[in-house]
Each structure stands twice: as C-alpha cells, then as structure tokens.
Amino acid sequence: MKSFVFFAACMAIIALSSLVQAYPQKLPVPIPPPTNPPVAAFHNSVATNSKGGQDVSVKLAATNLGNKHVQPIAEVFAEGNTKGGNVLRGATVGVQGHGLGASVTKSQDGIAESFRKQAEANLRLGDSASLIGKVSQTDTKIKGIDFKPQLSSSSLALQGDRLGASISRDVNRGVSDTLTKSVSANLFRNDNHNLDASVFRSDVRQNNGFNFQKTGGMLDYSHANGHGLNAGLTRFSGIGNQATVGGYSTLFRSNDGLTSLKANAGGSQWLSGPFANQRDYSFGLGLSHNAWRG
C-alpha cells in the first residue's frame, strides 16, 4: 500500500509539472574542420529495480567530432546495481553521414561478452517524410557454456509528418522469432503540447512450441518544457491483459541548456490471467551534462 501511495504521489507531481509549464554533390575536397567545437556529453541515471537495489547507468559520449558531411560516433558506458553483482561495461564506435550510419559495440560483464554490429539508412521522401531501415546482429559468448546466443534484428519504418508505420523482426537464435507491426499517429500538436497514439501487434514464435500474440496501444503526451505522460494496454493471447502508465518531468535545466535533471516514474498491473492484480512500480532520476571544448 505504501509503494502505491508513493507511486501515486510521484505521478501527481509529474502531472502537475506538465500542466504548469533539413547539399549538392561535389568533387572530393579536403575535409574541413568541425563546424562546431567537440562536445563531451555525460549521462547518468538511477532507477528502482523490482528485485532490489537501484540500477545505475553512466554514459560518456563525444559528439561534433566531424564536419557537416561525416560525424564519428564514440561513447563508453557502464551499468550496475547498488546491491552488487556484475557490472556491464562497454564502448561504441561508428560513423554517420548523408543518411547512412554504421557502428559496433563491445560490452562485457562477469558472465558474458557481446559484440553488436548495426547499420542504418535514412532516405528522405520529400520535406516531411522519410524511409528508415535498420539491421543489427549481436553475438554473445557466455563463460563455461558452448551455446553462443545470437540476436538478429531488422526493421523498416515509414515516418511522415503526422503518420508512421513500421515492421520489424527479431530472431533470437535457438529461442524465439518475433514479427512486430505498428502504426502511429499524431492526434494533436501545437507550440507547447503534443499527443501521439500508437497500436502494434507482435507474433512471437518460440522454439519450445509456445507461441503467442501481443496486441496493444498507447497514448503519449509531451510538453515543450520537458514533461510527459503515457498510458498503454497490452493483451497477451492466452495469458492476460496488462496496463501500464508512466511519466517524466524535467526538474532542472541550466540557463545555458547544457545541464538537466529529469525524473521518471512508471507502473504496471496485470488485469487478468494467472498474474491478475500483480503490480510493478519504478522510479528514476537522470542527469545529463554537455561540456563544450575549444
């Protein structure tokens, strides 16, 4: 009961906060220097974990390393729990430009190490629409086990000014194959407020023979000052229905806009099925800072 009251209070604070507040082709030329000084961006977040402790994540990324044609990608990160256990750490390097991008990520903890390769392409279709394609593959090695999990993902999305649609496939080798289709629409938008709606369907086929579908929808509201609320309902065929709510708020933003502190809260409850009335809550804080050099 106390946790529910605490969650309700967090959501009330967030809700109150939200109410109160696009080059022609040329012959190769020497690569010009960066048009803006490089930026070191620091991100830190803390979130509750239903199994105990607080999940802490830290990320340091370097941006504006290239020029208006090509932008390198570089970041390091670490994630862990205050109760102890294995700490996930890794790094990402890549490059992007002219609507194309590619990156690799290496991560490891005390049990396994993973290597992820990703590529994406963004094709502009006029002034307000684009076609976005992404593919990725993650290979994992687990200490002491011969089985090497591999996760492959691919997606294609058409994004317009107010409408969007996507289809994706995730294959977890030896475990499952998931096909997801979704549609989104902007219901309302002005200088300060934005309201989006989305619906989706996922067909999950598991190697053990247990197959099921997930269908659902969500409403997502956001305010220009950095506040937002969302609510969704998901139906798991043969299992039950689950409702989710969440919100976030910008608690602090520096005058120069380089530093910000955000809070988020969320909760879910099973409405039917074998998990009926089971609830889960979360609360988190996120700190971001961009340090200009040069």
Curated annotation (Swiss-Prot):
One biological process term in Gene Ontology: defense response to bacterium
Intrachain disulfide bonds: none
Domain of life: Eukaryota
Propeptide span(s): 23-24
GO cellular component: a single term: extracellular region
Modified residues (Pyrrolidone carboxylic acid): Q25
Membership in a protein family: Belongs to the attacin/sarcotoxin-2 family.
Name by which UniProt lists this protein: Sarcotoxin-2A
